[in-house]
Amino acid sequence: MEKLSINNNNNNRRYQSRRFDGITIIRIVVLVFIVTVSTYFVNSYTCNQPHHNHSTRPSHYLPINGTHGLMNNDDSLHNKGAIGHYNTTVSLERRADENNSTTNGLFPSTSSSTFIFTPSSSSSSTFQQSRSSPQTTSTSSFVATTSSFQQETSQTSIPDTTTDFSFSSFSEAPTTSTTSSTSEFSSTPQETSNTVTSTSSTSTSSSSSPTSSPATTSASQHVTTFSSVDNGKTIVVTRTSVISSSPTASNSNNNKNNDNGGGLSHTNRIVVGVVVGVGGSILIGLLAVLFYLRKRNNRDYEGGWTFWRKNEKLGSDEFFNGELGVRDRNINQGSNF
């Protein structure tokens, strides 16, 4: 009677090899997931870095036509969402020829003086203008706000002419508008007074600093003043051009989505993060379930002893040439040992 035993060491080796294969698969999956997430965060950090491209201009910079020397775009002078940097030129021109005709309302000029001021969206700007004449009192005020600019100028001639001028400007978004206006002016000569009174001019300048906001409204103003003397009467005509613009809501949204023109937008980064996180978790869960089922189906139930019945092999060399197990009830169990 032969007594055969199964090599438990071989079974243990096969079980351990299967276990090591499963652990290796899990390690590979976790490593791939970590590399994917790391790449995503590196790309997100790279996309958040500012990209300075001086060859192109973002779409929210509105061109301004019809102005001379009013606009000076510089990347160091504007914030995100701002319109740009404007230089506003104010010209005061006085008639110097002998023609005192006032029929056209606008007079040619032969001399001019220029005052330049630079408003910005984050600091207060001051504009001062002074003008003196023997028979004129001039008051000029300039108020800068985030929504509009107002220019009020009044000239009074003493003793024989009164000229009133008022101008109010408006801002329009998102287009750029140039408004030129001349107010009503009345001349009331008074010949009863022959006294010449010399009055010094008074100039008042006031400014208020604008409040910074994400959508900044910027405006520039160009003022030209013409003056002429007609039979002892001083006639002043002021022409004011106001250019105001502000970025629209669609431009602001496009700037947020483009994120300085490089990489994925904010919404796309959120979508990619959700897809990577949820998809990676589902993939790891499926692999874990498959590995568990495979391990469960491959369990070995071959432990213990295996007996052969007597004279079952009949001298054959084939290993499985008999019935496994002691199943013959007539067999003597004691003879097997």
Curated annotation (Swiss-Prot):
Which compartments is it annotated to reside in?
Cell membrane; Cell septum; Secreted, Cell wall
Q: Which UniProt keywords apply?
A: Cell membrane, Cell wall, Glycoprotein, Membrane, Secreted, Transmembrane, Transmembrane helix, Virulence
Q: Where is the composition biased (Low complexity)?
A: 124-220, 241-259
GO MF terms listed in the record are:
calmodulin binding
* PTM summary: Cross-linked to the carbohydrate polymers of the cell wall.
What ranges does the Extracellular topological domain annotation cover?
Answer: 43-269
Transmembrane regions listed in the UniProt entry: 22-42, 270-290
Q: Which GO terms describe its biological process?
A: calcium-mediated signaling; cell adhesion; invasive filamentous growth; MAPK cascade
Kindly give the membrane topology term recorded for this protein. Answer: Multi-pass membrane protein
Q: Which segment of this protein is annotated as the motif Calmodulin-binding?
A: 301-314
Main location, first listed in the record: membrane
Q: List the disulfide bonds.
A: none
User: Cytoplasmic face: residue ranges?
Assistant: 1-21, 291-337
Coiled-coil portions: none
Location of region: Disordered: 124-224, 241-265
Mutant lacking the gene: phenotype:
Shows defects in invasion of agar medium and attenuated virulence in a murine model of disseminated candidiasis. Leads to hypersensibility to the glucan synthase inhibitor capsofungin and the cell wall disturbing agents Congo red and calcofluor white.
**Glycosylated residue positions:** 53, 65, 87, 100
List the InterPro entries: Mid2_dom (IPR007567)
For this chain the motif Glycophorin A maps to 273-277
The answer on whether this UniProt entry bears the keyword Secreted reads yes
Any one GO CC term of this protein is: extracellular region
The family note in this entry says: Belongs to the MID2 like cell wall stress sensor family.
- Job of this protein: Cell-surface associated glycoprotein that acts as a plasma membrane receptor-type protein which senses the presence of matrix. Binds to calmodulin in response to environmental conditions and initiates a signaling cascade that activates CEK1, thus promoting invasive filamentation. Involved in the maintenance of the cell wall.
What's the record's remark on domains?
A: The GxxxG glycophorin motif in the transmembrane domain is required for CEK1 activation and subsequent invasive filamentation on agar medium.
Annotated protein name in UniProt: Cell-surface associated glycoprotein DFI1
Q: Which organism is it from?
A: Candida albicans (strain SC5314 / ATCC MYA-2876)
Q: Which gene encodes it?
A: DFI1
